[in-house]
Structures are given as C-alpha cells and as structure tokens.
C-alpha cells in the first residue's frame, strides 16, 4: 500500500545547440547526458547546465549536411572511456570525449535500424536494413550474422507426445467446428513503424527481438540466447504492438496488444507463451504505445503513450505512465502528460541504470527533465481519537482508501474509492488532528480536489464503496464527500506544459493552506517553497482557486517535508541531508536551520527517503530512514538494519532485517537509550520486540486501538497486536476507568486479567462497583475471578516501560486475592445478589483459604428458597457450576464437614459416588450421639484437632480413645487447651507429652512439661539429662532429698557439666552442694578461670593451693599458648606461601591453555566456529559417566565427598580454595584467643612471672600483625571477579575473550563465595596488659 513520491526534479532547457535532439544516453560516472542530433553529439551536465563536449559528425562526413541524418543509438562504454554512436546510414563510430577523436569501427551498407548493447557491455547487436542481425564483441569483431526472420520455432520447441488430436479435444461453446477453423493472422497495427525492437534480459544471457513477419504482416517476438541461437518464438498474438521490454529480474517480457475494446500491456514468458496482462486506461485506437521501460530493480514499468489523431482540431498529448504491481494488481501510480507540439514533445526517455527510481526524459527544444521518486505510504496522522487510520493508494484516476479503524481488507480491495476526472499524482491528508480524515488530491491537470468527512446531504457520486458495500448490508461508515476542486494559479502556464510535475511534496497544513515545493527556474541548486491559499469565492462555484500567497527560495534541493501538528513545525530536508525548520503559524514564510539541544545545525549524514518528527524525552527530533536501511535521529545513526518505521502517539515502531518489529516508548527515552536498544542483539524487555514475517513493512497503526498493520513483500496484509501497544492502550483505558474496553481487549489478546487490579490497586478497589456494572456479564466476571493470583503482574509479566509512581495499596492484614474477592463480593451483593450468584460463589472459592462451607450453605439456601428474580440461578445450576471449580470429592468432604446431611446428600447425588457406599455410612452417623457423630466425621475428614474437641465433650469414658488419638496424631498442645490444668486428664496428657518429647531428645522442654504437671521425678531425670543444673536442683528440693542424696546428685551434675566444658558451673555445684571446694578449684584451673579459683582459695584460706596447683597450672597454660601460637604462625605462613604459588601456577596454566586453544593458520575460522562446542563437551565430560552406582550414591558418601571437596593435598583441583579456608580458620582462631590471653597475662603479672608474660604478649602481638599484614595479599580476588563471564564489546579482543572464557571454566561454585570474603578481625578487643610493656 505504497505510492511513488516525487522527491526532486532536475531540469534544463534552451541549450544553444544546433538541430533537434533525436536520442540520448547517460554517462553514469560523471553524471552527464549525451544527446544526439542531426548535427552530431553534445555532452551536457544537467546540474550546472553546461555543455561539456560538442562532437560534430557532419564535418567528419558521418552525417549528411542536409540535416536528414539520424543517430539511432548512443552508448557510453566505461572500460573503453569512449562513446559508441550508430547512424541510420550504417556507420558505427567510436568517439573519445577527452580527445574528440572519431573512429569508424564498422559500416553496414544497408543501414542500421537498431543498436543494442548487452547489460555487461560485452556484446553489441545491430539490426540492419537487410532484415539481419549482426552480433559483435565489445571490440567490434563480428561473431555471427543471421536473418531476423526465422522459420524454426527455436531450441525450446514444445514436444507433442501424441496424446489425443485437436479434432477430438473439447472446444467449449465454439463447438467441434473450432477444430477445423483456419487461423487468420492480423497485420501489424496501422501506426506501427515496422522497425525491429531489441531488449536484453538483466543478466545478458538472452535477448528478445520484436519484428513484423513479412509473410503474415503481424508482429512476432523471438528469443535468442547469448550464443546467438534461437530459443523460442511467441505464439500468434493479434494486435501485438512494437513496444518491447524484458524485465531485468528475468521473469517476463512486456509488450502491448490491441484488443477489440481495450489496449493491454501483455507479458510473455521466455518460451514465447503469454503470462498475464493489465489494461491501459484508454479505449482502442485512442493512443499508441511508443515504448515500455522497466526500472533497474523491476519494480516500476514506464509506459510511453501518445494520442492518435481523431479529430482535426483536437489537442494531442503524450503520456508517461508509471505502473507498479502489488498483490497481483497493477496500479497506475503516476501520469505525466506532455504536449505533442513544440518544446514539450517527448523525444526519448530512459531509466537510470544505477539509481532505480530516477527517470530521464528528453523533449524537443533541448528540454531535459530528471525525476527522482521514492516509495511512501500516504496515511492519516493518527493524532486524534477521531482518526480512522486511513491509508490511500493511487490507482490512475482512482484513490483506493482503506479505513483500518473499521475494516482490514487486502489490496487491491479497499473500503471506498474516490473517482477523479484525471489521473492522480499526489495525495495528502490534513495535518490538523481534528481534520485528519480529510484528504486532498493533486491530479495530472494540477487541480487539487478536497474531500472532507462529515455529514453530507446526499451520496457523493465520486465516492464508491468497496469491500464494505453490498446489497442488504448497512454501512456504518461515514464516507467523505467532494467539497471542491481548486485550480492552482501559476504565473506562467508554459512551465506547466513543459514540466507536468511542477509541484511536489504537497502538504495540507491548515484548512485553507497548502505547502508545496517547486524547483527554481533560476538555479538548479535552489528550491522554492510555495504557500498556497484558498482564494475567497462564492460558495456555489464549482471550482475554486488556489493562489501562491507567499514563496521563499532555499539554497539546496528539498527532497522531503514532514509536519508536526502539535508543535506546528515543518521539517524540510535538503539533498545534502541538511534539515531546515519552518513554523507554519508564523506570519512570514521564513525557514531556519533545525538545531539540536546543543544549538548546532542538524544534518543527516546521508539523504533520507522518509522523515518524521517525534518528541523524544521532551525534545522535538527529526527521524530519517535512508534507502540503505540506515536510521537516524537528528544527526545520530541509531541503527543500520531498519526497513520501515512509523511514529504513533508516544511510540516509535520499526521493522528490521532480522524480521522483528520493535516498539519503543519515546516519552522518557533518549537518543542514547534508543541507540543502545536498537544496536543490541538481545532485547531484555519482552514488550519491545516481536517476530514478524520476512520482509514485513509497517503500513499504519490504528489510533486508540492495538492494531499494527503490516504489508508483506507480495502485497498481502497482516494485522498484529504488538505487546507494547496493547499494554499501553490497556493502561490508558484503566487510567480512564474504562474497564469494559480493557477487559475485552485483554480477553481477546490473552493478556493476564490480573493487570486490571495490579495496574493501580487503590483505584480498582475504589471502583469495584463501576467494574461490575461495566462488565455486566456473569461469565466474564467469573473469568476474571478464575485468572486471579497472588502474583503482581506489573513486576513479573508486564513491567511498565517507565517505573510507575502509583503506590501499591495493600492491606497488611490481608492478601491480594482476599481483598479483591471480598470487595467484588460486597459490590455484587449490593447491585444484584441474584444475578451475580455464581460470581459470588466464585469469590468464596478463589480466596486464599477457600470458604467452601459458606459456598455450600449458600447453595443449600437456594434449594430451600428459590428466588423469583428472572436473573437468578437455581440450586442445581449453582451446584453444577461449583463442581467445575472444585473437585467433587473435595466438595463432598466439605459438605460432610458442615454436619448437614441434607447438604451432603445434595452434593453426593451430583458426584460419581455409589449410593451403596455413602448411604450406609451416613445412616450410621445419624444414629450416633451428636458430639461423637461430629468426632467421627472430623476423624474421617482427618480434621483431628476438631475431632478431639468433640470427643473431649463425650465424657470420661471416651478419654482413653481421645488419648490414643492425641498420641497418634501428636496433638498434645491442642489437647491441653481442652482440659483444666487441675484435672487428671490434663496430667495424663502432659505426662504423655513429656514422654514424647523425651523420645524426640528434647529433654529440657520435656522437663518443663513434667514440672508443670507435678511429675517431679520425671522432670528431674529430664533436666539432669540435658544438663540444666539449676532446674535439676530445684526438682531435687521439691522431692525433699537428703543431704547425702543431694551430694551424690551434685557430683553427677558436676561430672556432666565438666564433660560439657562448663567448668565454672560444675565448680559452683561442687562448692555449694557437695562442699568439695578443692575439687571445685581444680575444675576452675582446668577451665582457665584463674581469678575464680583464687577467690575460692582465699575464701577457704587454703593459700597452699596457690603454690601446689595454681602457679604450676598457670605456667603450664603459658607453655601451651606459646606452642599454639608458634604452630598457628608457622601454619599461616606455610599456607600463605603455597596459596601465592598455586595462584601463579594457575595463571601460567591458563595462559598455556589460551595459547593452545587459539587457532592458527588456515583452519582458524573452523576452530573459532567450533570452540564453543568443544568447550561445552569438555566441561560436561567430567560428569558423563554411565555407572549407575555413582548416581545412586548414599547420602553418607555424598557428605564424605563434600568434606573432601577442598583438599590441601598439593595439586588438587581446588587446592587454592582449601588454602583460603584453612587461612580463614587460623585468623578466626587467633581472633577468639584474645580474651584468654588477656586473662592469663593478668595472673602472670600477679605472680611475678613478668618475663613469661612479656614473651607471651609479644609473641601474640607479632602473630596478629603477621595476619593483618597478609590479609590484603591473600584476599585480593572477589567472587564476582573470579567468576566473570566472557567480556564482549567494541574494546574486546580475541585474547581477552578467550582469557575470560578460561576464567569462567575454572570459576568457583556459588556455595564457595564466602571464601573470597576476607575474615573480620575485631580490633576493639582489649587484650594487651600495659604493665608488661
């Protein structure tokens, strides 16, 4: 759905040269034009309008002096730096334009009618006056000469296998006589010049020749190969015209055919058979086709037509039509009418061989025109809610308009057609947002027809419905109506006749103001901006007038123009990429350079064929796309693989060569973020990217909707709903409290319905009644309930592109599900509880803890009291629906848990249960006492806590059964709440609970339970086992033990405490309960409690113990500390040195591996491609054993292997980790030793062991300093550095990537991360004794 848009026009005329132009050719490298006349050859630069060379051929005798000479062909030869000229008299001349030297390289006595060079300029073909074809090499050496008329069909002659005869075949309505009809041949067309036509295929392997057969007088097309062997002859085609053009892509040969009532362009295959056609918009014998020309990429077919003389005084014209094809339909995209008289009569035209959409036209009077076209999609702006997403396609004198807001139909179908009196060249939509559905059409007669959408008193005859019409169908579409046609008033009509496309880039900026571009007549490097204003006139006049209210000249050729209706600015792009700015609301027509935020003028590095204006991060920017898929924002290239783009609202949508469509929000974006996102091969945000079909291009975006229209290369359409557009539109609807629109869109496009709440929980909970009233559908509300989940989808599935400022309002005492269910249920009960009965039931079921009992009770109420409301549901319907939400067995159990047997029977009847199974069970239950009945039900339902509650009310005779259930199900805490603490049942349960805790080795809790219920002996045993000596002695006091029993208990306790290294507690027990203070002192000395031992010595006045026990113990402890410190210091130093050595060895090994793995020589590319595969198998080979015993290793073996994972054995794989672990242990043990050293230093000083104290203090200080100095050297690497992923980027090299990869292979697992954190040393601990310094 694209049209051809004229970018620029280059023109020169009135060159002072003799004679009249006859033909022309192009020199692609210098960009000049070679024009031949009856006098000779001239070379003109179309930009500077200067004559570069003039080669007279009359003076050299190659052309006659009577001006009757004719040049039939000109060809620029790049490799020979010369120009080849062929004259009708038969001379082939080689001209060097640098030296002006002429050389006649050959002559044909019978004359030359056609000279045609192959596309590769290796061969040249001459058609002579003797009806022969001569093929020569590029050095003009003859290869072969053959007759142009051949009797043979060619090498590709069809083979008949003899199946059936013509006489026996079916001939349709013509009957059997058709088999005996003699085929007649129509002669050539009356206006046919009978000259041969030659055309080459794009690759130069074949050429086709159209000639008039001397026998039949009809045209035939023959195909020859490069070796000059005839391949095929076309089937007889009545009315075949002389025009011939082989499609460069090689598939079809175009020609023309006159039919009884029309004139067609027909296509031949290489085998000579017809394959398709399209009809020209003229009647038979109204025009003749002079020539057909394909552009370089086979996308545009130019048809050169000329009016035939019908009346004496009729004005004859020549037309150049540009036809394009899409979805197997041919569109007439442009029509250029020229006069057949005077300077504007066309002499020749040709496509540029390098620039595909550049057309060169040569007219009489030395008038030359050069047109540059590009593809464009003419669509409405989409800046307003009333915009219908219109897209207009030009097809001759018709405009095919598709309204994508209401219909999506594939081209060439459309919503409606606009019929105009002349072929259309340009179409534009109004830039005003409220008028964006109005469109203006510029036709070939330079009239502008304005169509406006609105109420019209009658149906406009120029507007015809397309795909939305039909008998019996009511059309809801408001079609536009023709308001008026405007004639543009030019200062000179002569310019319009010589250049039919005087105006380009037409834009409708205000209701009565247009902007258009025209090339300057004064200078080829200037453009003129015209401001066209509607001339006031009478309303009843059929035709209005547009006058040029103001004009301004711009240095440079304007090739594109785009508008922004919000800022009222227009961006004009010059051919060199420079951007100019024009504010259309300014009183004067003035332009200025477009500047970036830094104040510098913006210039695209390359000219762009599509430009748009967009607000990016609050700054208005110019976006451009080149024909080479390079995408620019201002003067910054952000991507080089963009095939199309569109700006919609605050979004930028792009399609790429990687067959993706990306959508970016421009509201808070920047050029750098867009550049980073488009250059990244992986897009993290799932909203941004989606895959599309290969070759897709953006057509338009439907406003206030989620539809993105894409067109495939063949022409068919595809509608996609881009996730970013969908979510953005849903968020807008939710912000406007438009729940119904949001819900319908989410349901259709499978967006999680949790977003309705999670987008703004507070607003949703405040508007739940609005939500219910808007949805107003029971099934839809149930669907909403069923999709609810506790997850916040705005943080997981649909994170907003910009962090939301909405505060998540959540009740700290409830969950999301409970809040929504309760709020919606209250709203539905207020609105209509009978209508919304099923959603109310769903709200109970969907809660975090399903309230099935309440649900069943509501269903039971429905059974007894059927409401009279017509919207109400019956109990049976409610129960059926409930069975869809909840498993029937679970529902049966919950109904049983209500103790309502009527409800149980109602549910059981809907289940698959056998009545023989549940009826006896229910009958048995009915016969039981109420409490025991409920106990039995709860026990059956495994609700044991409720079961013991009911059983406890049944009386003492059931206590044994209750106690057994308590023991079996471990319900001690719940059971203790059911009986008073003074009861015997309470004591029995407590004793059972304590025994259970003893079995679980929870001795202290067991002792507390026993003590609480008065079982002191059991409590003493439990406290004694766990070493709780205070509670043990308390229980002993309550048991009234004798002193002897208490002393024995004390010694037992002291022994257990000593085993647990609780020497101080053991000493207290021995001193206070066994009066054995000497043993207490020994235990204190063993526990290094020096000061407490001295206290007891002085308390009992046993000073002799100081000499006999205390001092020797202190000296012994001193020696042990010294030995320990020396051992730790030596271990630390040894491990540290080994760690540094291991690290150095690993670095060397990595470098060796890197050198070994780096590929060299001719196989480097192969190894680089397979390196990832090799490394992957290498890493997994350690664990690819097939021995099943390894996988079945017991947990004991696994724990053993885990302990052996870090081995200090030299050369082990993780030796460095084992050394770090050992060094960490040394540091921590030394840090914990500070308090002990401080205590022994005090007693060493007290007993005058100053030398030993100073030595211990100095040794400990040296050891600590050694450790502190070594910490930065040992813990240099962090875990993140050690496990870094391969670094990629513009600054990376092959070596750095491979080194990072090697580092990744040897990285540590996550569980060992804490080893790389240096241990913390508490420097605040005071351990030094200043008296020893």
From Swiss-Prot:
Cellular-component GO terms for this entry: cytoplasm; cytosol; elongator holoenzyme complex; nucleus
PTM annotation (Phosphoserine): residues: 805, 868, 1172, 1175
Name of protein: Elongator complex protein 1
InterPro entries hit by this protein: A-sol_ELP1, Elp1, ELP1_b-prop_2, ELP1_N_b-prop_1, HB_ELP1, TPR_ELP1, WD40/YVTN_repeat-like_dom_sf
Residue ranges with Basic residues bias: 1195-1207
A GO molecular function held by the record: tRNA binding
Entry's transmembrane regions: none
Homology family: Belongs to the ELP1/IKA1 family.
Recorded superkingdom: Eukaryota
Associated pathway: tRNA modification; 5-methoxycarbonylmethyl-2-thiouridine-tRNA biosynthesis
Chain spans, region Disordered: 1177-1209
Region (Required for binding to tRNA): 1192-1210
Location of region: Mediates dimerization: 886-1333
Keyword annotations from UniProtKB, A to Z: Cytoplasm, Nucleus, Phosphoprotein, tRNA processing
Known partners and oligomeric status: Homodimer; dimerization promotes ELP1 stability and elongator complex formation. Component of the elongator complex which consists of ELP1, ELP2, ELP3, ELP4, ELP5 and ELP6. Interacts preferentially with MAP3K14/NIK followed by IKK-alpha and IKK-beta.
Modification after translation (UniProt): Phosphorylated.
Pfam family, one: TPR_ELP1
Key word Transcription regulation present: no
Primary localisation category: cytoplasm
Function: Component of the elongator complex which is required for multiple tRNA modifications, including mcm5U (5-methoxycarbonylmethyl uridine), mcm5s2U (5-methoxycarbonylmethyl-2-thiouridine), and ncm5U (5-carbamoylmethyl uridine). The elongator complex catalyzes the formation of carboxymethyluridine in the wobble base at position 34 in tRNAs. Regulates the migration and branching of projection neurons in the developing cerebral cortex, through a process depending on alpha-tubulin acetylation. ELP1 binds to tRNA, mediating interaction of the elongator complex with tRNA.
Compartments in which it is found: Cytoplasm; Nucleus
PANTHER family in UniProt: ELONGATOR COMPLEX PROTEIN 1
GO BP, sorted A to Z: tRNA wobble base 5-methoxycarbonylmethyl-2-thiouridinylation
């Amino acid at each position: 759905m694209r049209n051809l848009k004229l970018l620029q026009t280059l023109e020169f005329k009135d060159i002072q040269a003799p004679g009249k132009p006859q033909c022309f050719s192009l020199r692609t490298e210098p960009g000049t034009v070679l024009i031949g006349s009856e006098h000779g050859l001239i070379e003109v630069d179309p930009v500077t309008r200067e004559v570069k060379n003039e080669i007279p051929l009359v003076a050299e005798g190659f052309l006659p002096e009577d001006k009757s000479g004719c040049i039939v062909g000109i060809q620029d030869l790049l490799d020979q730096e010369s120009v080849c000229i062929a004259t009708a008299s038969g001379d082939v001349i080689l001209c060097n334009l640098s030296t002006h030297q002429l050389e006649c390289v050959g002559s044909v006595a019978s004359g030359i009618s056609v000279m045609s060079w192959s596309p590769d300029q290796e061969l040249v073909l001459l058609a002579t006056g003797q009806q022969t074809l001569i093929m020569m090499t590029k050095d003009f050496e003859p290869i072969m000469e053959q007759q142009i008329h051949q009797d043979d069909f060619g090498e590709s002659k069809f083979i008949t296998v003899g199946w059936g005869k013509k006489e026996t075949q079916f001939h349709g309505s013509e009957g059997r006589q058709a088999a005996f009809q003699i085929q007649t041949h129509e002669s050539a067309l009356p206006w046919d010049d009978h000259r041969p036509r030659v055309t080459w295929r794009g690759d130069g392997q074949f050429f086709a020749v159209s000639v008039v057969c001397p026998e039949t007088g009809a045209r035939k097309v023959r195909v020859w190969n490069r070796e000059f062997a005839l391949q095929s002859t076309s089937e007889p085609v009545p009315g075949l015209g002389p025009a011939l053009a082989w499609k460069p892509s090689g598939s079809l040969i175009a020609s023309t055919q006159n039919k009884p009532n029309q004139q067609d362009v027909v296509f031949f295959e290489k085998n000579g058979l017809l394959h398709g056609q399209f009809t020209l918009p003229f009647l038979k014998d109204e025009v003749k086709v002079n020539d057909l020309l394909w552009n370089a990429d086979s996308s545009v077919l130019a048809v050169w037509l000329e009016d035939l003389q019908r009346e004496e005084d009729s004005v004859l014209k020549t037309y150049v039509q540009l036809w394009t094809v899409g979805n197997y339909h041919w569109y007439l995209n442009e029509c250029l009418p020229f006069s057949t008289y005077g300077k504007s009569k066309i002499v020749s035209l040709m496509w540029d061989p390098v620039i595909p959409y550049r057309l060169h036209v040569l007219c009489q009077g030395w008038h030359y025109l050069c047109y540059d076209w590009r593809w464009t999609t003419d669509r409405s702006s989409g800046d307003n809610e009333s915009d219908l997403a219109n897209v207009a396609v030009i097809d001759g004198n018709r405009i095919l308009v598709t309204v994508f807001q209401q219909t999506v139909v594939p081209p060439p179908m459309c919503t409606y057609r606009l019929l105009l009196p002349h072929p259309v060249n340009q179409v534009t939509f109004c830039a005003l947002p409220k008028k964006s559905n109005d469109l203006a059409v510029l036709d070939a007669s330079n009239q502008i027809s304005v169509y406006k959408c609105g109420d019209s008193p009658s149906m406009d005859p120029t507007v015809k419905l397309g795909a939305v019409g039909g008998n019996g169908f009511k059309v809801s579409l408001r079609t536009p109506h023709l308001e008026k046609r405007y004639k543009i008033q030019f200062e000179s009509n002569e310019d319009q006749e010589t250049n039919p496309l005087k105006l380009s880039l037409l834009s409708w900026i205000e209701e009565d103001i247009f902007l258009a571009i025209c090339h300057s007549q004064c200078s080829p490097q200037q453009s003129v901006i015209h401001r066209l204003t509607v001339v006031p006139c009478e309303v009843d006049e059929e035709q209005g007038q547009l006058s040029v209210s103001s004009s301004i000249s711009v240095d440079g050729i304007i090739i594109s123009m785009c508008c922004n209706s919000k800022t009222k600015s227009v961006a004009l792009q010059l051919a060199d990429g420079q951007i100019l700015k024009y504010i259309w609301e300014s009183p004067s027509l003035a332009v200025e350079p477009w500047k970036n935020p830094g104040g510098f003028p913006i210039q695209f590095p390359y000219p762009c064929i599509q430009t748009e204006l967009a607000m990016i991060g609050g700054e208005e920017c110019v976006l451009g796309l080149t024909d080479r898929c390079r995408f620019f924002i201002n003067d910054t290239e952000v991507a080089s693989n963009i095939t199309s783009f569109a700006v919609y609202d605050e979004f930028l949508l792009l399609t790429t060569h990687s067959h993706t469509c990306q959508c970016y929000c421009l509201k808070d974006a920047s050029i750098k973020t867009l550049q980073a996102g488009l250059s990244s091969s992986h897009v993290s945000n799932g909203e941004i990217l989606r895959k599309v079909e290969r070759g897709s291009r953006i057509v338009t975006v439907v406003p206030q909707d989620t539809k993105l229209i894409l067109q495939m290369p063949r022409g068919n359409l595809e509608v996609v709903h881009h996730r970013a557009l969908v979510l953005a539109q849903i968020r807008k609807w939710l912000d406007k409290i438009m729940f119904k629109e949001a819900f319908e869109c989410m349901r259709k496009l499978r967006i999680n319905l949790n977003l309705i709440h999670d987008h703004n929980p507070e607003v949703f909970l405040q508007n739940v009644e609005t939500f219910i009233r808007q949805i107003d559908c029971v099934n839809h509300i149930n669907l909403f309930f069923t999709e609810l989940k506790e997850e916040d989808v705005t943080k997981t599935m649909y994170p907003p592109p910009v962090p939301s400022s909405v505060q998540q309002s959540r009740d700290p005492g409830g969950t999301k599900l409970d809040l929504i269910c309760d709020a919606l249920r209250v709203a539905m009960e207020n609105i209509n509880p009978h209508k919304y009965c099923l959603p109310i039931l769903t709200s109970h079921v969907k809660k975090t803890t399903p309230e099935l009992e309440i649900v069943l009770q509501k269903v039971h109420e429905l059974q007894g009291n059927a409401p009279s409301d017509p919207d109400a549901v019956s109990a049976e319907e409610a129960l059926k629906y409930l069975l869809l939400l909840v498993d029937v067995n679970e529902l049966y159990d919950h109904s049983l848990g209500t103790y309502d047997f009527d409800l149980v029977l109602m549910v059981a009847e809907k289940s698959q249960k056998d009545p023989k199974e549940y009826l006896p069970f229910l009958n048995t239950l009915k016969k039981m006492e109420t409490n025991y009945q409920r106990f039995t039900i709860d026990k059956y339902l495994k609700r044991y806590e409720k079961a013991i509650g009911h059983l406890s009310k049944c009386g003492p005779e059931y206590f044994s059964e209750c106690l057994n259930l308590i023991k079996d199900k471990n319900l001690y805490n719940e059971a203790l709440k059911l009986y008073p603490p003074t009861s015997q049942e309470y004591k029995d349960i407590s004793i059972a609970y304590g025994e259970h805790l003893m079995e679980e080795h929870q001795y202290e809790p067991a002792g507390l339970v026993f003590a609480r219920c008065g079982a002191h002996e059991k409590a003493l045993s439990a406290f004694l086992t766990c070493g709780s000596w205070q509670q043990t002695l308390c229980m002993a006091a309550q048991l009234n033990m004798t002193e002897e029993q208490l002393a024995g208990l004390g010694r037992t306790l002291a022994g257990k405490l000593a085993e647990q290294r609780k020497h101080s507690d053991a000493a207290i027990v021995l001193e206070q309960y066994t009066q054995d203070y000497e043993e207490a002192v020994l235990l204190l000395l063993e526990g290094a409690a020096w000061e407490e031992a001295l206290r007891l010595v002085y308390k009992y006045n046993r000073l002799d113990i100081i000499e006999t026990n205390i001092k020797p113990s202190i000296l012994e402890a001193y020696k042990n500390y010294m030995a320990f410190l020396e051992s730790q210091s030596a271990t630390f130093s040894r491990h540290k040195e080994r760690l540094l050595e291991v690290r150095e060895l690993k670095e060397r090994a990595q470098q060796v591996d890197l050198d070994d793995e780096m590929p060299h020589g001719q196989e480097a590319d192969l190894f680089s491609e397979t390196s990832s595969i090799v490394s992957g198998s290498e890493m997994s080979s350690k664990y690819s054993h097939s021995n099943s015993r390894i996988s079945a290793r017991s947990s004991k073996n696994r724990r053993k292997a885990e302990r052996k994972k870090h081995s200090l054995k030299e050369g082990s794989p993780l030796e460095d980790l084992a050394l770090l672990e050992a060094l960490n242990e040394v540091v921590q043990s030394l840090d914990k030793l500070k308090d002990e050293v401080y205590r022994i230093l005090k007693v060493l000083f007290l007993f005058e062991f100053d030398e030993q104290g100073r030595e211990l203090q100095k040794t400990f200080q040296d050891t600590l300093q050694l450790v502190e100095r070594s910490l930065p050297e040992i813990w240099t690497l962090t875990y993140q550095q050690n496990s870094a992923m391969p670094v990629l980027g513009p600054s990376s090299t092959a070596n750095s990537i491979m080194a990072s990869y090697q580092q990744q292979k040897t990285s540590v697992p996550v569980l060992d991360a804490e080893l790389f954190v240096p241990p913390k040393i508490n420097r605040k601990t005071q351990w030094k004794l200043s008296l020893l310094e």
